[in-house]
Amino acid sequence: MKKFLVTMLFLLTFVNTGFANDGTLLYEKNVQNQIDLCGAKIMNSNQIKEPVVFVYGLNEKKNYLKSAQNVTSRQVIVYANDYKYVSDENELAAFLSREIALAVRSYDGIFKGMLRSLQMKASPKKFEIVADKIAVDYMVKADYNPIALITFIQKTSPQKRYDTISTKNLTSKRLAIIYEYIYTKYPYYLANNTYINNEFYQRFLLTSQNNRRLLQEKIKNNSKENLKYE
């Protein structure tokens, strides 16, 4: 009797594990499909001809994706840790647009983009801002709301004390530049802001008062200077 019970428990555990694995595979397949469709829409809408592949990998696949020989630098890898912050398709488009921008830039220039890739590594702050702006353009052309880039970054990039010796810009600086870019080039989205009641957008408004005040002064004075956001 004891052997029978032990055997049944083992079988039940095996079956439950099988169902769990099936559920995980189905979930990954659905997420991958969503990422592929969103990525394809962005690339088609922006007439991007360079090949870029999208890969959804859970944390346990991270090392494999980095080391596999058939994985190139032109693959956009979306980890579960990134995807969990995506609240809607606009935010997914925000994430993918930035990564596509960086991947496409790696094709530019001589030596099949090798020099450009080295430049990006040498000036990460500069290209971080460039990618943010290109992402806004990509999103608008693909009929996505670029304000979602603000809400996504607000959630995923904690503010640091300073960026003097960092390879990344302060989050507040990035968001201020994105806001100014949208304000200047795509004012429709701010005038008809569907994210106005979004808690993360409200958080941005609260923490960006000084930077937005600088922008208002710039507009008031009809200035063309590049503001030194903090």
Question: Could you tell me what each predicted segment is?
Answer:
Residues 82-83, 90-91, 99-115, 142-144:
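Catalytic Zn2+-binding segment of zinc metalloproteases
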Residues 106-126, 158-159:
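Substrate-binding clefts and substrate-entry loops adjacent to catalytic sites
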Residues 78-79, 96:
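A secondary-structure boundary/capping signal
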Residues 21-63, 69-70, 75, 83-84, ...:
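C-terminal capping/extension segments of zinc metalloprotease domains
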Residues 4-16:
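Sec-dependent N-terminal signal peptides
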Residues 96-105, 130, 134:
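Active-site His/Glu-centered metal-binding helix of metallohydrolases
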Residues 20-25, 80, 113-119:
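Acidic/histidine-rich, surface-exposed loop or edge segments in extracytoplasmic proteins
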